[in-house]
Structure formats: structure tokens, C-alpha cells
Design a protein with these regions (language model features):
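Active-site beta-strand/loop microenvironment that shapes enzyme catalytic pockets
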Residues: 79-127
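Flexible, glycine/charged-enriched surface loops at secondary-structure junctions
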Residues: 51-53, 128-137, 163-165
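Hydrophobic side chains in well-ordered alpha-helices
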Residues: 35-38, 117, 150-154
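Short glycine-/aliphatic-rich beta-strand segments at the starts of folded cytosolic domains
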Residues: 130-145, 170
Length: 170
């Protein structure tokens, strides 16, 4: 059984850097489709913002097929990538970050953007409450009634949860 941390509740962190307003949202998302839906939800919430950058570790923290990010118009590699790096460093799975930027008229440069987006996610992660997720698999076992006690003992020894029992005659 694999287990890892996931967000328990959503987080919002806001800061101003050189007159630009950065609002970071973190939320539990299971899969990239939910991550993209979360991004669309935040984008609709802030239609006048200049950028809506996102990053997601949408599965287990070690599952590279469930990663995604977007710079949403910022110079390539200055927003989504540092956001994703911060998420991966947290070892939290099933998490998405969206950072909304209201441009304040002062250019931050590529280094400034990398720091602003990455740090926003890091600060939000410090506020994040997590809970442990245990991945489980469902199995169906058919046996004679005479074998039932042996199977129950085996399940107990290996911490296997019996979800349902059906005693039908076959």
C-alpha cells in the first residue's frame, strides 16, 4: 500500500512585489483534469488579472505522468516551472497551485519572476494542512464457508480490511 500526504483544505496566500499583486491558491486536485478545472475556476474569479499561472502534482508525488504547469504568457520557465519545483519539494500529492498576477507596471525580470512565483507557492505551502492518503486495492474473494475463518485470520494478520461479505449459496 502506498501512502502519501494530500491537502486537507485550500490555502490562499497574497503578497505585493514591486507593485504587482500575486495571489497564490493551493487546492486538492485528483488528476490533471481536476487541476485544469481548478485553474479555470480561479481564472474566472480574476478575469482582469494579467496572468493565471499554474502547476500541479495531480497524483502521487512520485508519479511523473501526473505533473503539469503553464507560464500563461510569462517568459518561458519563469512561472510554472518554479511553482512545480516548489510543489515537488513539498512531497505532497494531488495538489495544484494557481498564481494570479495583477501587473503593477514595474518589470521584475526573469529572475524576479522565478523568485516571485516560486516563493508564493512556498509560502502558501507553509500554511497548508495535510492528511495522509492510503491507496487501496479492491479484491473479490470467493471461498467455501469452511475456508472463511482462515481467510479472515489471514486478512487480520496482513491488515486487510474486509469491505463486504456475502454468504450466498452457489
Amino acid at each position: 500500500m502506498a501512502e502519501y500526504l494530500i491537502p486537507k483544505s485550500a490555502v490562499v496566500f497574497e503578497e505585493e512585489i514591486k507593485k504587482s499583486r500575486f495571489i497564490t491558491y493551493l487546492q486538492h486536485t485528483e488528476g490533471l483534469e481536476q487541476a485544469k478545472a481548478f485553474w479555470a475556476e480561479i481564472k474566472a474569479l480574476h478575469p482582469n488579472a494579467r496572468h493565471h499561472c499554474w502547476a500541479a502534482v495531480a497524483g502521487r508525488p512520485t508519479d511523473s505522468q501526473q505533473l503539469g504547469f503553464s507560464d500563461d504568457g510569462e517568459p518561458a520557465g519563469t512561472a510554472g516551472k518554479p511553482m512545480l519545483s516548489a510543489l515537488q519539494g513539498s512531497q505532497v500529492g494531488e495538489i495544484s497551485a494557481v498564481v494570479v498576477r495583477y501587473y503593477g507596471g514595474i518589470l521584475l525580470g526573469t529572475g524576479g519572476l522565478v523568485r516571485a512565483y516560486g516563493n508564493g507557492v512556498q509560502q502558501a505551502l507553509k500554511l497548508l494542512e495535510t492528511e495522509r492518503k492510503v491507496e487501496r486495492q479492491l479484491f473479490q474473494v470467493h471461498c467455501d464457508y469452511a475456508q472463511l475463518n482462515w481467510i479472515q485470520i489471514l486478512c487480520e494478520q496482513h491488515q486487510i480490511e474486509i469491505y463486504q461479505q456475502d454468504f450466498q449459496v452457489q
